[in-house]
Amino acid sequence: MPTVCLLPLLFFTIGGCLGSSRPFRTFVVTDTTLTHLAVHRVTGEVFVGAVNRVFKLAPNLTELRAHVTGPIEDNARCYPPPSMRVCSHRLVPVDNVNKLLLIDYAARRLVACGSIWQGICQFLRLDDLFKLGEPHHRKEHYLSGAQEPDSMAGVIVEQVQGPSKLFVGTAVDGKSEYFPTLSSRKLIDDEDSGDMFSLVYQDEFVSSQIKIPSDTLSLYPAFDIYYIYGFVSASFVYFLTLQLDTQQTLLDTAGEKFFTSKIVRMCAGDSEFYSYVEFPIGCSWRGVEYRLVQSAHLAKPGLLLAQALGVPADEDVLFTIFSQGQKNRANPPRQTILCLFTLSSINAHIRRRIQSCYRGEGTLALPWLLNKELPCINTPLQINGNFCGLVLNQPLGGLHVIEGLPLLADSTDGMASVAAYTYHQHSVVFIGTRSGNLKKVRVDGSQDAQLYETVSVVQGSPILRDLLFSPDHRHIYLLSEKQVSQLPVETCEQYLSCAACLGSGDPHCGWCVLQHRCCREGACPGASAPHGFAEELSKCIQVRVRPNNVSVTSSGVQLTVAMRNVPDLSVGVSCSFEEVTESEAILLPSGELRCPSPSLQELQTLTRGHGATHTVRLQLLSMETGVRFAGVDFVFYNCSALQSCMSCVGSPYPCHWCKYRHVCTSHPHECSFQEGRVHSPEGCPEILPQGDLLIPVGVMQPLTLRAKNLPQPQSGQKNYECVVRVQGRQHRVPAVRFNSSSVQCQNASYFYEGDEFGDTELDFSVVWDGDFPIDKPPSFRALLYKCWAQRPSCGLCLKADPRFNCGWCISEHRCQLRAHCPAPKSNWMHPSQKGARCSHPRITQIHPLTGPKEGGTRVTIVGENLGLTSREVGLRVAGVRCNSIPTEYVSAERIVCEMEESLVPSPPPGPAELCVGDCSADFRTQSQQLYSFVTPTFDRVSPSRGPASGGTRLTISGISLDAGSRVTVIIRDGECQFVRRDAEAIVCISPVSTLGPSQSPITLAIDHANISNTGVIYTYTQDPTVTHLEPTWSIINGSTSITVSGTHLLTVQEPRVRAKYRGIETTNTCQVINDTAMLCKAPGIFLGHPQPRAQGEHPDEFGFLLDHVQAARSLNRSSFTYYPDPSFEPLGPSGVLDVKPGSHVVLKGKNLIPAAAGSSRLNYTVLIGGQPCALTVSDTQLLCDSPSQTGRQPVMVLVGGLEFWLGTLHITADRALTLPAMVGLAAGGGLLLLAITVVLVAYKRKTQDADRTLKRLQLQMDNLESRVALECKEAFAELQTDINELTNHMDGVQIPFLDYRTYAVRVLFPGIEAHPVLKELDTPPNVEKALRLFGQLLHSRAFLLTFIHTLEAQSSFSMRDRGTVASLTMVALQSRLDYATGLLKQLLADLIEKNLESKNHPKLLLRRTESVAEKMLTNWFTFLLHKFLKECAGEPLFLLYCAIKQQMEKGPIDAITGEARYSLSEDKLIRQQIDYKTLTLHCVCPESEGSAQVPVKVLNCDSITQAKDKLLDTVYKGIPYSQRPKAEDMDLEWRQGRMARIILQDEDITTKIECDWKRVNSLAHYQVTDGSLVALVPKQVSAYNMANSFTFTRSLSRYESLLRAASSPDSLRSRAPMLTPDQEAGTKLWHLVRNHDHTDHREGDRGSKMVSEIYLTRLLATKGTLQKFVDDLFETVFSTAHRGSALPLAIKYMFDFLDEQADQRQISDPDVRHTWKSNCLPLRFWVNVIKNPQFVFDIHKNSITDACLSVVAQTFMDSCSTSEHRLGKDSPSNKLLYAKDIPNYKSWVERYYRDIAKMASISDQDMDAYLVEQSRLHANDFNVLSALSELYFYVTKYRQEILTSLDRDASCRKHKLRQKLEQIITLVSSSS
């Protein structure tokens, strides 16, 4: 056997449980999978079976030995194995999966059975795992070659004399001729004996084995028996099994499979298996059946459980786990249940069954084994419990299910394994779950199972079936695929109080009283003493103290502590108060303790700063153990902290109020006057409640207050005063105490300034002796008021608060008190007077002034003296009665009334008329304004289109639209949110569309008038989306430009961009350019702190307000960054700078180029004297050329909405030359000759430079030529090597087919995952009835044809509508595919006829989806070719997809452009030389940190997202894409040692910027090395802000060189174009190749490029590598019989139909027939599937894979074409690529069509039978009612046209189809 390196690890793991953090030991493997566990019952050593390994571990999980068992050269088809006979099948290294691990105690050896060589076993010495033997020479040595590790169970039965026996049950994987499913075998002491594993008994008729009959396998090919658990009890051997339920499973192999659990029993001494009996077994809970057995464990019941069950305590019981239902054996439901069986009950069922059979009753009832029903034979025989069978009446099956007792149900974790044992009187059950948890359950009765603890062991990794105890039952061993864990059975120490300990439910735990801890009884030193160890909650110590409170001024108070449930305390106890003070307690004869309270000094320490009370813990400390074992709360109170009498005597403590000293004290003797002491609230001085104290302004009056217990001031004490505080001023008024119950403030008047308030509340109190306040009730209020303030009219005066006693002084025209109004008495009016009403009402305003004549307008009338109640006011408006609305009436000021309908045809305008009481002249008025009746109309809505999510600001134009008081705008069923209106327009915000994109009518409701206009329609369109921003940064101030790409942007009326930072939201404007682009100004953010970080700030949210489209409100949080605002220095100290005209001006500043913005620059404008200047920008300065003008010019810089005034430029020109200077200049002309000489010398030098440049270019050309040669050589080498490599990788790939429903929906309704046809329809009964009638109507061919032809005739019936109707029709007819096929044929015939009549070329038929029939044809094939896809064509298509994906990912892929080194598409080919290295990273599995690391190959140039995708692809290989995590939800963590963990990201502070380009981070950028350890961890909330700043700082010393070189160029690659090129203004994002669509690449950039066409050799290399997979797919599709699959009937049937149509129309051109068939099937169905494999499989298709599949699909289309392909040097590369293959493919297509034509025709009857069966299989996959509801939409939309068409059609008239449809329409309408 080969030697394989293994890296097992021993860890201490922290277990996460309910309150527990105790570490437990683990043994972890990284490069194998663990399968089985065995624990030695004496030594406690642990043996672990695994794939290719067996381990021996010490009890503490330290590895002692490892034994290698594989891989082995083998082939599953070799029988006998290759070790015995040369095998014709190819041998490859095969993993040896351990399936059985048993300790043979008698022979001191380990039996380890595996999967290789047809299931041979090894015998290993227990001491060192030395291989004692490996029998593999006889057929008895081959147990089963099945690969499942948990499908085998075995039991060793030791014999008193002779060898032990091995009872073994196993799944046989369909090979029943080789392996028995159950057998009894000899375990010989000599491992090399030929008799080893031989059957215990065998003759020519009978043997110790059970085999699955071949007849059973021929009927049920999937039949097998999976053995879950085996055990011995008394003299019987038992097995729990799972097997196919042949009673419920249909013979059809593709149908649903049902399984049943059975218990098998045999006598241990039965050699002939005559005693074989099996019974169905299961459990039920709340009416739900649980029939999938998962695990079981045999144990003894605890005494309590035994008593509850009524069985002896030594009886065996079986704890069993079942999953719900009978389906999904391999992946059972997580709904599981723990059940209990007693062996006596099971044996009783079996005994009764045997007895009934021996009485001749019934049959043997074992159809899978006997293949027929054999009757029981009546045999007079006494059957007892130990009966072991005869040759007759066997084997025997049970007739009913043995039901267990349900104990515990779980619906989330998925219980998977179980173990149990007895502790004291309790049964304790341990359960492992599929989510990696351990559950602990106490079972004390059949109805008493308590889950008391859950421990997280291996998060997310299932606990396997083997769950075993250590010999002393102190630990339990759990097994998962990568880890063995040793956990203590109890963690009592986690509970810190007696209540928590004894309330936990853990039977192991009790409370050790004097040790004050939770532990086992044996761990408690004083447990044997009375009350030393508590096991019941009621036995916890209870402590009371008398007194339970003491004043802070009292010390040394003797406290008596009474206790219950305490042990002997004679050794001594001390008392302590929060460790501040401790004193020894005196033990009283009564058993109580006596403790002193703390001293005054100690009390100050305890209570300082704690106010009136402070609760501390009085603790009792045992002198025996030195432990504080009990405590009780104790209160110290401080009376002096209470400042009022009521709070003092009302406290729960003995506080006393000293009335004359105004203090609270705990000592009554401290009161200086005996009569001044108060000890109850009744004795407190207090102002009594008497309602509000009302004080009119300016009135001199005394204030008398009722009180009680008012103290009489003593000698030397001051008298009473009233203290009033108003508007910040304090007034003290002398007061007189009449007696103890009355006090009066002396005459005084009170004022407050201003008339803004009619009254104001005063701060009013009564004090004595200067500052002793008398207590007031909480409700006491004093109000100071002015009658005239805010009451200028009679009406306002009379509605004043009656308590103020204000009235209207008629002569003074003023609101006054009665005393202030001159006589006579009638001159003063008060509301209490009978008939009081104000004269001279006046209307100042009415609103609105117009309304509809239908009435309903609420008219608001404002004025004065408008009555005191609404009942006394009468109203008419424009001569029409207006009814007052009492709830909106404001006394004297405002009346709101509702207009009745005007019955006059054209009512004239008129005033509002009002009477108060009667209509006499003094009490009547009318308005100056006139009210008019109008007729509002509207004729236009603008805009007429908007997104379906609503939010569009609509303007509805018309006339008189401001009429009335209320307006409601309804768009179909939704209310448009009102904004404003005027006479010509109403503005409102559109609601969300309930129908999605659609046309909707508009209705206005103005009061009681309803206005509509059928000519005005509002159209809901698709919601706009935002797909890309450029750039993704701004400055703090915002206002920089952002270019936004998206879809449907023109439908947005007022788009805005928004940012939210620290709870503050800001927005800015956007301008839509076209439907896919808009330009926005970035919003600024408010930092809240002075200095932003240089690396930028990320807003909490960043997105767009696109009307009400929610999806755009918040984009990816981390993608937008705000950098610090630029700042500038002034022009010199004085602000003035002197320069010459045209010279450079340097403007210095900071943050001029944002830190991570690359070459995307801020747009600076520098104005000098108002004129812009040319700029050069660097990080710290702007270089500007000064203008030509002179003088003082102001300098201003504009950037991103910021303006900087830097100072003034003083531009001074040189003065004109003087005459001597001019003479000197002329004299210099003599030097001209010298200048000419200089020019000649320069020319010579230039010539030499040109020669040197020529040589340099020649050298570059030579270098380029060598690189081209190397590239071509590499491409050729890759072509030769990649094919085999790719083929090997594809072997064994699992195909993640989508289920039929999902597949069909994706093809029928592309892009709509949750289509209504998948959901139940919630409708009123009438509508449901109508839809069912509509469904019946669809089954009338005349109606359906008329319906479809009518829809197609409508100009507004779009292409999309045609596809939708076709798909909905097929769904609605899913249950009648035979009828749908006939309809489809008729529609196709009509289409052919129409095509020929319109003189179109016949070849154009079925080319596009311009009719319902064409889409129906696609859907028809979709339904009927699903099985062919799954069984035949799906495999090559999936392998092609995988091959393309893997081949693309072998080389670099640009994350921005999507270009790749390997590609079939020229458009997606990298045309540069990219240097890269392959790295192998070791990835920690996301679900389980402790599991084995997975090696993953990546490229050092991969972007981080690409690396994450490759890691996920490898870690979750074989897992459907929808069931695995997504890269965007995970962070990539690079781990260096224990502490250093770095989060890698595509962009962070180290992102490199070079000139105008910002480069995406790659693995090479982070300097990740080969062999590095990485982990995928769930993405954190702030993955960059938190993780990066922390991790990079911590690891700076290691990576400081990386950070310093953050701008150096590095090699980066990508896997797929998954990064959006988020670009800033002027900055381009790049990964591997700079996008040269930009025109601003640097000079010389092209100099580094090779001739791009050279790289087209890569296309050929990639094409050659993938050729096999393309050929396989085409061959499968274009073969009539391939891979054992016959041609689908649908293809032959449809091709024959097309030939019939051609014959009927005398079309003899073979090219036309060929084209019809190509358009019908390959182009309509296969091309769609090839381009969109995600329709068939649960996968993700990236852009490079899509591009390559498009090339394959184009080749497929070209292969089906009859036209000649004329290719030249200018033809597209994808045409040239397959140019030589297409003729061959064309021949395949022609042969395929010929072969189909030669096949026997399918009769309509046979086809109908096939279609009926297909309908039955998928009858319930879709909700037909929902489909009918969707179809009915088109009836509503084109109702009149359809009804008209039904009238015109004779057949429809004959069957009265119009009336039937109208009946349906009526039914629907009646429910709306």
From Swiss-Prot:
Expression (tissue specificity)? Detected in embryonic hindbrain, spinal cord, dorsal root ganglion, trigeminal ganglion and superior cervical ganglion. In newborns, detected throughout all layers of the hippocampus.
Q: Which GO terms describe its cellular component?
A: plasma membrane
UniProt organism field: Mus musculus
Sequence intervals crossing the membrane? 1221-1241
The keyword Isomerase is assigned to this record: no
Q: Sum up the protein's function in the record's words.
A: Coreceptor for SEMA3A and SEMA3F. Necessary for signaling by class 3 semaphorins and subsequent remodeling of the cytoskeleton. Plays a role in axon guidance in the developing nervous system. Regulates the migration of sympathetic neurons, but not of neural crest precursors. Required for normal dendrite spine morphology in pyramidal neurons. May play a role in regulating semaphorin-mediated programmed cell death in the developing nervous system. Class 3 semaphorins bind to a complex composed of a neuropilin and a plexin.
Show the Gene3D superfamilies listed in the entry. Answer: GTPase Activation - p120gap, domain 1 (1.10.506.10), Immunoglobulins (2.60.40.10), Phosphatidylinositol 3-kinase Catalytic Subunit, Chain A, domain 1 (3.10.20.90), YVTN repeat-like/Quinoprotein amine dehydrogenase (2.130.10.10)
User: Ranges in the Cytoplasmic compartment?
Assistant: 1242-1872
The family note in this entry says:
Belongs to the plexin family.
Encoding gene per record? Plxna3
Chain segments annotated as coiled-coil in the UniProt record: 1240-1294
The answer to whether keyword Secreted applies is no
* Listed result of changing residue 1506 to A: Abolishes response to semaphorin
Task: Note the SS bond partners.
Answer: 78-87, 113-121, 267-388, 283-339, 357-376, 492-509, 498-540, 501-518, 512-524, 575-595
In the bilayer, the protein is annotated as: Single-pass type I membrane protein
Consequence of mutating residue 1300 to A? Almost abolishes response to semaphorin
Signal peptide positions (record): 1-19
Residue positions where Phosphoserine is found in the record: 1597
**Disruption-associated phenotype:** No visible phenotype, but causes subtle changes in the central nervous system. Mice exhibit altered apical dendrite spine morphology in pyramidal neurons. Mice exhibit defasciculation of the facial branchiomotor nerve and of the ophthalmic branch of the trigeminus, with variable severity. The number of neurons in the dorsal root ganglion is higher than normal, probably due to reduced neuronal apoptosis. In mice lacking both Plxna3 and Plxna4, migrating neurons do not show the normal response to Sema3A and Sema3F and do not migrate away from these semaphorins (in vitro).
IPT/TIG domain mapped to chain residues: 841-934, 936-1021, 1024-1123, 1126-1212
Protein name listed in UniProt: Plexin-A3
Spell out the InterPro entries in the cross-references: Ig-like_fold, Ig_E-set, IPT_dom, Plexin, Plexin_cytoplasmic_RasGAP_dom, Plexin_RBD, Plexin_repeat, PSI
- Looking at the record, the residues that make up the Sema domain are 20-489
